[in-house]
Each structure stands twice: as structure tokens, then as C-alpha cells.
């Protein structure tokens, strides 16, 4: 009963909104989350739940699969360092509100040490430790190089390396040109542009959240929810034929999920107006073109006249504003498209297979 409930809860249709809500609550109450007491209780409960879950053979097989173990370690480290950032940000924000300086600005923390031998010895020990760890890993876990690729046979499921699983999960909702080219380029450009977009001088060199709420919140949402969450889904919850499987569900190669995805043009002309699709491509896709145009070009101008938009323009200027809004809308297009697929089985806003252009 509990396992069936958790299997349904893990479905991205439910888990994605749930993770988004938890993300918002985490930063809203970051001073409570960023406490040692919270870490202790969270660790105890998580270990208890994980130990109970490991009694299930299907869950254990997924977790102990050699290719998945690094992702499990990644998740644990990610949770800890995310808590650590909130813990230090909470302390510094309280100190700043009290008129004190951040911990990183105290004389004890600003004390300088010699590169030799302090830094060099530390790096040497780290290299030795990592080498020993990797040697033991290679001996214990069987993950050898396989035979040369066979063009007549493909593994099922065929998964990309873990760092590309987020992109592979995006392929469920976008065409390859969008999920494999445009969105990765936007990610790279956004990361490069970020230091030049943010003119806020506060928060440099020390942990804080109160002084950089918008920047930290948007970046963390893109990193944790729109990237790490998709990697976790692709690693642990996508099985044969890229079908969703719950964490306690057996990977049945014959599982069939009935889906009937519909384009926006079909919604508009066939379902709403009860007529055939127009023969002209641009007339047929006119609803999707209008929706996409409003989203990409009208919303940035409309947001300019809001109080938040005016404040943003005063702080960073018009050029930075439009670049920032363009990148933000590109990032938000992913969760919007996911929600539209789940709620309305919407496949494409614009479907032009004649030009190999589907959006």
C-alpha cells in the first residue's frame, strides 16, 4: 500500500510540482532549514526511510546498479552542501541585521596562510585519498568497458551519461533541436552572462540569501529543479522504452502506457471549432505562433510597467533587462511545457514537420 502510494507520488506529474513547492518552502523558511537541529532530524528520518526502502528488491537493484551509485552519492552530497549554504547564509544574515559583519569578514577568517606547505599538502592528501577511493571502487563495483558498439543491437533502456540525462529527459517534451541544441546553448550563455547581469555588489565573498534573494532563487531553481531533478528522474525512474517506473516497481519490458498527445493546432481547429485543419501551414499554426509570440515578445514589455519591472530596469538598465528576461523565459519554457503535456497532453505549440520545426 505504502509502496504503491510512493510509486504514484514519484511520477513526474506529481513529483515535479511537489519538488517545486518544497523548493519554495526551503528558501522561504531557510533560517529554519539551515539549522543543525533540522539537519539531524532530516538525516535520521532519511536514513530510516532509505533503510526501509532497501528491503524492496526492485529499489535495491536500481540503487546498487554500478552506473547509478555515483548518482546516489551525488544526491547525498548535494543535499548536504545545499543545507550548508543555507546554514551559513542564515548565520550571516542574522549578523548583518544585528549590525555586525559576515563571518567571512572577521579577522580570524581573513587570516592568510602560505601556499607551501599548507595548500600543497592539502591537495596532495586529497589526490592520494581520491586515488585510493577510485581503485577500491574499480575493484568492488563491476563496471568494465564493454565490447565495441553493435549497430544491430541497442540497449533498452538506452541512456546517455548521467550528466546528459537532464537533456534526454527534456526530449520527452521538446524536439531534439530544442532539447539538444537551443536549451543547452541558453544554459551556457546564461551561465556566462550571469556575472555581467547582476549589478548587486552585496553578497560577494560571503554566504547570504537576504541580500541576493532573486538571483539565488532563480539560479537555484534552474539548477536543483530543472536540472538535478531531471537527472534523478532519468537515472532512477526511467526504464525500458523510456517509460516511467516507480522506485519500487519492477521494470517490465512489456509495459505499455497509452498516450494520445495533441498539437495546439488540433485543439484549436478540430476540438474547439469543429473543423478540419487548414491546408495553409501558417494559418494552421497561427494559434501557436500567436501564443509563442505573446510569451516571448509581449510579456517582457508588459512586465516593464509593473513595479518589479521598473525596479529591475532602474537597477540593471534596459539592455541587461531584456537579456535577463529572454533567458528567464527560456528557462521557464521547460516547466510550462511539462505542465501543458501533463494536464492537456499537449505535444507541440507549433507543429511544422514540413520545415522540421516543432516547438
For each predicted feature, which ranges?
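Conserved P-loop NTPase catalytic core
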Residues: 62
Amino acid at each position: 500500500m505504502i509502496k504503491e502510494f510512493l510509486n504514484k507520488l514519484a511520477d513526474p506529474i506529481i513529483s515535479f510540482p511537489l519538488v517545486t513547492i518544497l523548493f519554495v518552502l526551503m528558501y522561504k523558511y531557510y533560517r529554519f532549514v539551515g539549522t543543525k537541529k533540522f539537519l539531524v532530524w532530516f538525516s535520521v528520518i532519511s536514513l530510516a526511510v532509505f533503510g526501509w526502502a532497501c528491503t524492496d528488491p526492485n529499489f535495491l537493484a536500481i540503487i546498487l546498479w554500478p552506473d547509478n551509485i555515483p548518482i546516489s552519492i551525488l544526491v547525498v552530497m548535494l543535499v548536504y552542501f545545499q543545507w550548508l549554504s543555507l546554514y551559513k547564509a542564515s548565520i550571516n544574515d542574522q549578523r548583518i541585521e544585528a549590525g555586525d559583519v559576515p563571518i567571512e569578514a572577521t579577522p580570524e577568517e581573513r587570516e592568510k596562510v602560505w601556499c607551501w606547505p599548507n595548500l600543497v599538502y592539502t591537495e596532495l592528501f586529497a589526490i592520494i585519498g581520491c586515488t585510493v577511493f577510485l581503485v577500491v571502487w574499480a575493484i568492488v563495483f563491476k563496471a568494465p568497458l564493454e565490447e565495441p558498439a553493435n549497430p544491430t543491437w541497442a540497449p533498452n533502456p538506452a541512456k546517455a551519461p548521467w550528466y546528459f540525462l537532464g537533456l534526454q529527459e527534456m526530449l520527452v517534451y521538446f524536439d531534439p533541436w530544442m532539447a539538444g541544441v537551443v536549451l543547452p546553448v541558453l544554459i551556457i550563455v546564461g551561465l556566462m552572462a550571469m556575472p555581467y547581469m547582476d549589478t548587486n555588489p552585496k553578497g560577494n565573498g560571503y554566504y547570504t540569501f537576504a541580500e541576493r534573494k532573486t538571483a539565488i532563487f532563480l539560479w537555484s531553481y534552474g539548477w536543483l529543479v530543472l536540472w538535478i531533478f531531471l537527472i534523478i528522474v532519468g537515472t532512477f525512474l526511467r526504464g525500458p522504452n523510456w517509460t516511467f517506473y516507480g522506485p519500487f516497481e519492477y521494470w517490465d519490458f512489456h509495459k505499455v502506457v497509452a498516450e494520445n498527445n495533441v498539437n495546439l493546432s488540433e485543439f484549436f481547429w478540430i476540438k474547439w471549432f469543429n473543423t478540419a485543419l487548414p491546408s495553409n501551414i501558417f494559418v494552421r499554426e497561427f494559434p501557436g505562433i500567436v501564443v509563442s509570440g505573446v510569451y516571448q515578445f509581449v510579456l517582457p514589455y508588459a512586465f516593464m510597467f509593473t513595479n518589479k519591472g521598473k525596479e529591475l530596469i532602474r537597477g540593471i538598465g534596459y539592455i541587461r533587462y531584456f537579456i535577463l528576461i529572454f533567458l528567464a523565459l527560456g528557462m521557464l519554457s521547460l516547466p510550462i511545457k511539462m505542465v501543458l503535456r501533463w494536464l492537456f497532453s499537449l505535444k507541440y505549440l507549433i507543429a511544422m514537420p514540413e520545415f522540421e520545426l516543432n516547438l
